[in-house]
């Protein structure tokens, strides 16, 4: 969580208070494994790249929801992070992308977008992913620095979903 911030989240804790009957699952992807499975040529290609992460892009332009106000855009300006992040505790490298990554610094926009989409598509291998099907009052904790996550769609008109989240502040990705 929070890749659109300069200092990113170290860990996230979420608690399922109200869950839909269908949909709303949370999927996780091991980004250590995704990086480690890449060929040496791919690793060399992306080693020094930086991606710009932008909340306005992921919320408004990418998904067409929750348009941000000008004040919100000023509070959350785009930030750049390395595409390959080194975990500060384990020293292992992992891909650091996801939905908020908009473009690659120094690359033509369309080319950078295509590369991000390709890398995001390469990451999820069946044995590197986990789908959590929520039960009421469950809690999950994960390390944001090496896992990518997303929720599946559900119908908010007919079903409720209330997730309480606490993000432990982290550090600047390197």
Pin down the residues of each PLM region:
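Non-heme Fe(II) oxygenase catalytic core, chiefly the N-lobe of the double-stranded beta-helix
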Residues: 1-139, 144-174
